[in-house]
């Protein structure tokens, strides 16, 4: 008797065996419907076997097979299996997340028949004789049916169609879907609208000449300053791939998927371009997946999950703003789309082109190791006015809720000239640090020489490297001042202060809270463009993708929260944010000014960024990372647990730590185990959050440790919700 082995979308690191009925045939990669507990689940077949270790009386039969063929190409199956193994995620969850929601729910993977309304002979007669003159809506509907009206498309309302059907004026006609590849749909049109194509400058032409003759897999890093014309390179590279008859996948950050981006691609090409964005419903997402798989679409533009789209013949992958943190999935299985795209391209033997004005340190290290090939665009396509940049030393400065008097005066000067001002708060990776406003002294752990993190809830200082903690000091350990402050400021708090200081100017605060409702962001942006708001407050949402010609002053308000963050990547993100922010000022004809507020103007990395630019900053930061044995010169994995009861989450991670200490003794003496300790934001939505960080200089050894954990610990029953994040980007 054959048995079928199923991967189910459950957080368990194993497969499930079922009886295969004699009348049923299945193939690996097809979906099946199976009983699971009291529910029915859609799973994916991973094997058909003749033997099983499960007692026969405990086995249940497969209820139904949903596909005749595998939903995954051999390359895609290999790729997703590799991803599940690398991120130590259950294969059932990975395969399920790689499919559109409708397929996870059991809908057909093949395009369905379309049902149309068509006039009957009586209906044709009614039209010819004008029998519906008094029923205007029915007449319009019957005329639409004559031209071919799809039943699901219902602009007239179901009552109109019911009335026409009752009169026997219409009938339903089934039509098989007509599948034409994107090449067939071109007919006599050229692939490219050549009138839209720009002439490349000397640097762009040199870069493109290298891309043009790419054969097979190459990981290209296009390192181009803002405004250097990376998008034009993308477009001409896509043209080359389309000329080969192949498809292209373009991955963009969440906040980079704007109508302007899409319209530029659509203006250039006469091919079918599908876009995967958050406003699509589940049916529309399924249709995009089906069109790509059958070769009907030529280009797919989407955010990170678009990577899992099935293609008929994928020829290249492009990743714009490859350094952007939104390419890392932050719920479910925590993959990084950038890293997976490189792996997938290598498996398919196709090029991957990654563009960035501020490449992450991991990518620059890959260039140094010869894993990536670097292409540079250092010249702006359109030269703009040079920026003035100044650092405000906050020590001894009079402050108003995070705003220095110098900044307030500069804001006043720009506003009085009728210009706009943009204030940025750096919140990502933020962990509050206690420092002295008078001299800049910080409370540091004497065991680790690292700043303590301030935990407001428990009113203590805690070291997130060795777990040491101490009470809040009453005065500065250096100068004796009682002016001890914490780094960090909220956008709402800043908005309240600005309303008091600048009561006569419009203020637009743009963050996740104020733009949560659909259409809010567009409304704020329209107010800014129309000059209704003169002061703009934002987080990274405003850092890129928007053109504000009247903004002449940009300020980074809380630089210190990044310079001494618990997250070792915070300085890198600050530098990337600074380069993006600097690009917001002086985009029109007027000169722009950029201000940074800090208690530590002499910080070496800050100085290298301001005086020598991002590239030198990144090289210096890499040297520092290597000395500290931090990624990319080591590998990390982060366990996160949360529970309504703090001690439950702590106890679970303590149990994990105890097991891992034994593994360390047995096979990984260089393994560092940090924690368990409360997360920097230790309570969220009523849940207490704890974490346990692992680090090892060898990626392979760390994965051996995680494989042992997966085998021995991962499937043990617990009421505490926990996740494993391999190569974590966010330690907060």
Predicted regions and their residues:
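Inter-lobe coupling/hinge segments of SF2-like helicase ATPases
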Residues: 192-201, 216-650, 690-693, 700
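Short proline/glycine- and acidic-rich turn/helix-capping motifs at secondary-structure junctions
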Residues: 672-685, 721-732
């Amino acid at each position: 008797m054959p048995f079928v082995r199923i991967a189910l979308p459950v957080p368990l690191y194993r497969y499930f065996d079922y009886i295969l009925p004699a009348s049923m045939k299945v193939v690996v990669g097809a979906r099946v419907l199976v009983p699971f507990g009291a529910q029915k689940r859609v799973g994916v077949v991973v094997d058909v076997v003749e033997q099983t270790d499960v007692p026969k009386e405990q086995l249940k039969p497969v209820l139904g097979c949903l596909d005749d063929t595998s939903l995954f190409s051999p390359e895609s199956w290999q790729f997703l299996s590799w991803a599940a193994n690398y991120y130590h995620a259950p294969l059932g969850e990975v395969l399920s997340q790689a499919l559109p929601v409708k397929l996870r729910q059991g809908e057909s993977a093949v395009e369905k028949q379309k049902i149309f309304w068509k006039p009957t002979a009586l209906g044709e007669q009614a039209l010819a004789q004008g029998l519906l003159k008094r029923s205007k809506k029915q007449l319009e509907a019957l005329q639409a049916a004559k031209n071919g009206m799809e039943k699901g498309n219902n602009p007239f309302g179901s009552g109109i169609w019911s009335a026409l059907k009752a009169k026997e004026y219409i009938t339903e006609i089934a039509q098989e879907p007509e599948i034409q590849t994107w090449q067939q749909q071109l007919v006599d049109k050229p692939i490219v609208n050549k009138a839209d194509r720009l002439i490349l400058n000397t640097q762009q032409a040199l870069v493109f000449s290298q891309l043009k003759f790419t054969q097979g897999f190459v990981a290209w890093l296009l390192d181009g300053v803002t405004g250097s014309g990376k998008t034009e390179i993308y477009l001409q590279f896509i043209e080359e791939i389309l000329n080969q008859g192949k498809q292209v996948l373009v991955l963009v950050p969440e906040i980079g998927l704007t109508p302007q981006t899409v319209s530029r691609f659509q203006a250039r090409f006469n091919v079918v371009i599908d876009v995967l964005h958050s406003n699509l419903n589940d049916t529309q997402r399924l249709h995009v997946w089906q069109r790509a798989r059958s070769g009907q679409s030529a280009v797919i533009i989407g955010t990170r999950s678009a990577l899992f789209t099935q293609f008929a013949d994928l020829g290249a992958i492009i990743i714009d703003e490859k350094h952007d943190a939104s390419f890392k999935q932050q719920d479910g299985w925590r993959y990084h789309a950038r890293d997976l795209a490189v792996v997938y391209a290598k498996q398919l033997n196709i090029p991957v082109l990654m563009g960035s004005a501020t490449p992450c340190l991991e990518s620059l290290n890959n260039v140094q190791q010869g894993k990536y090939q670097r292409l540079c665009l250092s010249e702006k396509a359109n030269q703009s006015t040079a920026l003035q940049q100044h650092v405000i030393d906050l020590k001894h400065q009079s402050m108003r809720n995070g705003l220095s008097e110098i900044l307030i005066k500069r804001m006043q000067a720009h506003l009085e000239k009728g210009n706009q001002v943009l204030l940025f708060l750096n919140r990502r990776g933020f962990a509050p640090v206690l420092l002295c406003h008078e001299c800049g002294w910080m409370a540091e752990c004497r065991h680790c020489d690292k700043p303590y993190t301030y935990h407001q809830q428990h009113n203590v200082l805690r070291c997130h490297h060795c777990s040491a903690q101490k009470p809040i000091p009453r005065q500065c350990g250096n100068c004796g001042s009682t002016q001890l402050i914490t780094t960090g400021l909220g956008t709402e708090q800043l908005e309240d202060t600005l309303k008091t200081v600048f009561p006569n100017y419009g203020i637009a605060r743009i963050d996740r809270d104020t733009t949560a409702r659909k259409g809010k962001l567009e409304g704020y942006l329209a107010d800014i463009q129309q000059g209704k708001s003169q002061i703009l407050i934002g987080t990274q949402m405003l850092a890129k993708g928007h053109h504000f010609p009247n903004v002449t002053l940009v300020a980074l308000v809380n630089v210190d929260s990044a310079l001494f963050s618990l997250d070792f990547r915070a300085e890198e993100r600050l530098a990337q944010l600074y380069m993006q922010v600097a690009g917001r000022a002086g985009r029109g004809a007027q000169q722009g000014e950029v201000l940074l507020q800090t208690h530590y103007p002499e910080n070496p990395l800050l100085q290298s960024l301001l005086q020598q630019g991002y590239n030198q900053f990144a090289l210096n930061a890499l040297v520092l990372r290597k000395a500290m044995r931090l990624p990319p010169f080591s590998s990390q994995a982060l366990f996160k647990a949360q529970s309504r009861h703090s001690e439950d989450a702590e106890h679970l991670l303590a149990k994990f730590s105890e097991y891992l200490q034994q593994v360390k003794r047995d096979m990984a003496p260089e393994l560092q185990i940090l924690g368990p300790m409360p997360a920097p934001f230790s309570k969220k939505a009523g849940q207490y959050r704890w974490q346990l960080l692992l680090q090892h200089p060898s990626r392979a050894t760390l994965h051996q440790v995680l494989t042992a954990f997966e085998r021995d610990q991962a499937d043990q029953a617990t009421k505490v919700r926990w996740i494993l994040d391999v190569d974590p980007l966010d330690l907060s």
